[in-house]
C-alpha cells in the first residue's frame, strides 16, 4: 500500500498530480478537495469515481488523516494549508509559489523543519531533462551571464477566466516568474542583490489594482543580469512570446522550440515546458577574426509531457520523504526565487529599485 495522499485543488496542476498518484504504486489517493464541486467531480470521474470528495480542506485533513498532502490551490491559501498539513504530521507537496509573502514562505519552511516532514515545492522545470541540460551549458559560459526569458500567454475563454481568478491573488511575474528566476539562480549560483519591475493593467475585466503584464530585471552579486517578462489575456501578442536565451563570455545557449513558439500555442500548458532543441553558440574566434566553431543544434530526445513531468515531480517527493533529497538547498532556492519576484512586484508598485540583503 502506498502513502495515503490527499489531493487539494483539482484544477490543471492538481489534476496532473492526481493522475501521477493514481499511476504510481508509491501513493494512494484518499480524497479530493476543492471549493467548487465541478472540478473535483470531473477529476473524480476521470479517475474512476471512487475517491471521497471534500469542499473544505480542514474537514478532509481530519477525516482522511493522510501521510501526504498535495496542495495545488490559489496562492493566498498556500501558507495556511501547508503549515496546517505539516503540523498534522503530513508530508507536503506544494505548488509554487510557497506563499504570497516572504514571511509566509519562511513560516512554511520553518514548520516543515520543526515537524521533520518533507516539503517539496513544485518547480516543474527542475525535473525536465532539457532544462537541466540548458542550465548545465549556461553554467559553462563564464561570468557574468545575461539571461533573457519570457512566457506571454494569449488567453481567451476558460483560460482567461482562470488567469483572471489567479490575478486576484498574484501577478504574472510572480506566478510564472518563480520558475524562470529559479533557473537563473541555479545558472549563476550567485546571490540576487537588486531588482526592478514594471507592470501594466491591460484590461477593464480585472480589478483596478491588478496588472496582467509585468517585466522584471534582476542583478546578481557576480555581475550577472536577467530579465523576465510575463503577460496574460486576449490582448497579448504572440510575437517572441517564448524567449529562453542565455549569453556569457564564452558564447550563448538558447531553447529553440519552434513548435512551442507557434502562433496559437502561447496558452498551451504542454508548450510551456517544450524544448525540442538547444542551440549552442561559441564565441571563440580564429586569428583572422572569424568564428572558430559553428553553432551546435542539440536535439532533445527526452521530451516529457506535462503529466509526465508531474509524475517525475512526485518521484522527487517520494525520494524526499525517504531522505534522498537535500531539502535545505531546495527550500533556499524556493525562498530566493520568491524574494526576487515579490521584490519586482514591489518595485513596480512603488516605482523604485528594490535592493535585497
Predicted regions, residues:
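Hydrophobic residues in well-ordered beta-strands that form the structural core
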Residues: 71, 94-95, 119-121, 255
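C-terminal helix-rich "cap/oligomerization" subdomain common to oxidoreductases
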Residues: 1, 27, 68-71, 302-304, ...
Amino acid at each position: 500500500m502506498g502513502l495515503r495522499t490527499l489531493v487539494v485543488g483539482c484544477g490543471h496542476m492538481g489534476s496532473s498530480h492526481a493522475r501521477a498518484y493514481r499511476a504510481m504504486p508509491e501513493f494512494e489517493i484518499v480524497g479530493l478537495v476543492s471549493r467548487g464541486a465541478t472540478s473535483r467531480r470531473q477529476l473524480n470521474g476521470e479517475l474512476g469515481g471512487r475517491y471521497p470528495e471534500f469542499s473544505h480542506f480542514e474537514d478532509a485533513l481530519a477525516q482522511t488523516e493522510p501521510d501526504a498532502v498535495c496542495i495545488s490551490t490559489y496562492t493566498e491559501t498556500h501558507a495556511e494549508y501547508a503549515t496546517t498539513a505539516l503540523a498534522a504530521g503530513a508530508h507536503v507537496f506544494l505548488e509554487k509559489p510557497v506563499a504570497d509573502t516572504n514571511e509566509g514562505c519562511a513560516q512554511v519552511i520553518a514548520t516543515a523543519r520543526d515537524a521533520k516532514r518533507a516539503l517539496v515545492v513544485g518547480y516543474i522545470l527542475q525535473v525536465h531533462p532539457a532544462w537541466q541540460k540548458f542550465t548545465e551549458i549556461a553554467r559553462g559560459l563564464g561570468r557574468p551571464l545575461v539571461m533573457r526569458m519570457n512566457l506571454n500567454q494569449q488567453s481567451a475563454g476558460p483560460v482567461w477566466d482562470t488567469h483572471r481568478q489567479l490575478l486576484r491573488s498574484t501577478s504574472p511575474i510572480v506566478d510564472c516568474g518563480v520558475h524562470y528566476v529559479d533557473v537563473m539562480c541555479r545558472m549563476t549560483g550567485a546571490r540576487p542583490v537588486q531588482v526592478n519591475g514594471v507592470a501594466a493593467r491591460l484590461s477593464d475585466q480585472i480589478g483596478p489594482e491588478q496588472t496582467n503584464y509585468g517585466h522584471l530585471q534582476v542583478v546578481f552579486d557576480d555581475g550577472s543580469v536577467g530579465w523576465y517578462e510575463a503577460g496574460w489575456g486576449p490582448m497579448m501578442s504572440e510575437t517572441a512570446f517564448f524567449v529562453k536565451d542565455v549569453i556569457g563570455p564564452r558564447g550563448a545557449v538558447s531553447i529553440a522550440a519552434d513548435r512551442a513558439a507557434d502562433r496559437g500555442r502561447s496558452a498551451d500548458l504542454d508548450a510551456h515546458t517544450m524544448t525540442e532543441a538547444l542551440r549552442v553558440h561559441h564565441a571563440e574566434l580564429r586569428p583572422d577574426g572569424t568564428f572558430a566553431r559553428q553553432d551546435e543544434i542539440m536535439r532533445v530526445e527526452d521530451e516529457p509531457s506535462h503529466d509526465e513531468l508531474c509524475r517525475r515531480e512526485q518521484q522527487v517527493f517520494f525520494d524526499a520523504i525517504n531522505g534522498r533529497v537535500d531539502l535545505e538547498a531546495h527550500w533556499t532556492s524556493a525562498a530566493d526565487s520568491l524574494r526576487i519576484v515579490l521584490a519586482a512586484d514591489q518595485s513596480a508598485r512603488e516605482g523604485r529599485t528594490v535592493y535585497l540583503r
